[in-house]
Amino acid sequence: MLVNVSLAVAVAASLLGSAAAAPLVAVKQLVERKVNASPDFNITFSSSHTDGLPRTLIMATGGTIAGSSASATDSTNYRAGSIGVAALVDAVPQLLNVSNIDGMQVSNVDSGSITDDIVLLISKLANKALCGSDPEYDAVVVTHGTETLEETAYTLDATLMCDKTVVVVGAMRPATAISADGPSNLLEAVTTAVSPASHGRGVLVVLNDRICQALYCAKTNANALDTFKAYEQGFVGGPLSTKPFFYYPPSQPTFKTVYDLSNVTSLPRVDVLYSHQMATFDGVNASVANGAKGFIGAGTGAGGISPWAKQNLAYVMSQGIPVVASTKINNGVVAPDEDPAAGSYISSALLNPVKSRRLLQSL
């Protein structure tokens, strides 16, 4: 069912043609590469400067961490993205003992409203902040809603062109809630981001006293504070008294691939198709007519889909549109078929459907 090729190599030419971003294999090569990012830093908040402290750029996008409610006991009916980056920093004065802070309000929405353009902008700004020939910052922290946090975190991990640290952080309770988790999460995120021990680990997700690698991290519970996990791979560490404590020396995930998006101005549309018994995927032709350039199948088990869905996917693949087989199961690998002639789906390997989508867009 699956061709014996990696997702990273198989679809680059078919998705973006000659404009495809070039894959970079060795992390050491990334440090030497120059980044030509075009967007400017529109700083909306700057802390007083303290000599000797590192400099951190906080890019705020909204989400529950910036949410508010009329009741301190209400952790469900609240307005996400109602508090600005300056208020987030002001609520945690201990941040200024750790780092000089510049804040940028990239957006202020719930994470379900985050667009491809916002994610691409964050990627370009992170590279400009950290990876240029004369970087302005020592670390980047992105505040984000938890619903799609893993998508943005993974995109940053797959597009950051140096070994400096980006941390993505959110909260499960709004800022107005009793025992709001946002302030402590933000302090731990900044402390982790500026720590030299965090270098060379890729993009990290920090929530609820846990540090998780972005490639493997996923939201696993709709409500609980301890929601972000990497079931099979485990956490890489956890903050102790807000300072990061890592369980292992710095390393990168085995299946990590990094792509240079510095010259990419927009991301192609890629849709995720959820499989089930008697799934047909009848809507794929309409999606193609409306601009879809690729599809991810959130398959049953190890990437399975129904015979009726296969018929529709076979048609769009005949038009040169790539289809990636992933799985809606939380863990496991969608392996390539041993017989390349068995079909033309692309294996997602360890990537879940939403991360497969982001990688396909980046190729």
Predicted regions and their residues:
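A glycine- and small-aliphatic-rich helix-loop capping segment at beta-alpha/alpha-beta transitions
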Residues: 72-81, 148, 154-167, 182-188, ...
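Short acidic, glycine-rich surface-loop motifs adjacent to enzyme active sites
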Residues: 133-149, 290-302
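Fungal secretory targeting signals
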Residues: 1-27
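C-terminal non-catalytic interaction/assembly regions of soluble proteins
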Residues: 21, 44-48, 302-363
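Internal gly/pro-rich beta-alpha loop/helix module
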Residues: 168-241
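Accessory alpha-helical/coil subdomains and C-terminal extensions
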Residues: 53, 59, 67-69, 84-95, ...
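ATP/NTP phosphate-donor binding region
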Residues: 25-129
